[in-house]
């Protein structure tokens, strides 16, 4: 009975011109809400700190630009990791991706207008800040004996 019903169903679909099985996206989107919310909170906090820092610097250097909202130009900075770095700390890749995403999100944040002569200084300061944080993490991991052993193999 069940086999006959399935055969009739398949033949009916083919006679109408519909494919079997139906072309429906059967993938269920899975979202880890806790992980997403933690990452969003971390990124928002970092964005706010960067925005606050830039606003303070601008207000100190040029008070006449306050109140103007502009979109900061996008500047993608990718810091390449060596094989040795990847071998020593598997979480380094995740950290690097988060840092890159943070910088992209920061560069899209609406902030007070920066005079053109200050734009390069502000961008360079942010790039240096990201590099210092990555370098700080590397220094912390360099004191780890596992780091020394795996780097000597590189």
Swiss-Prot record:
Principal place of residence: mitochondrion
GO cellular component annotations of the record: mitochondrial outer membrane; mitochondrion; sperm flagellum; sperm midpiece
Positions carrying Phosphoserine: 26, 116
Protein name per UniProt: Spermatogenesis-associated protein 19, mitochondrial
Keyword Phosphoprotein: yes
Transit peptide segment: 1-24
Tissue specificity annotation: Expressed in the testis.
Organism: Rattus norvegicus
């Amino acid at each position: 009975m069940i086999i006959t019903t399935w055969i009739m169903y398949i033949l009916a679909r083919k006679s109408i011109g519909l494919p079997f099985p139906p072309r429906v996206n059967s993938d269920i989107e899975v979202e880890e809400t806790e992980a997403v919310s933690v990452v969003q909170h971390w990124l928002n906090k970092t964005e706010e700190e960067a925005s606050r820092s830039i606003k303070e610097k601008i207000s100190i250097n040029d008070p006449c630009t306050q109140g103007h909202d502009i979109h900061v130009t996008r500047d993608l900075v990718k810091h390449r990791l060596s094989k040795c770095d990847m071998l020593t700390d598997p979480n380094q890749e995740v950290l690097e991706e988060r840092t890159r995403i943070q910088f992209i999100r920061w560069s899209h944040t609406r902030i007070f207008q920066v005079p053109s002569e200050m734009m390069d200084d502000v961008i360079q300061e942010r790039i240096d800040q990201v590099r210092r944080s990555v370098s700080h993490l590397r220094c912390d991991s360099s004191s780890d004996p596992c780091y020394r052993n795996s780097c000597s193999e590189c």
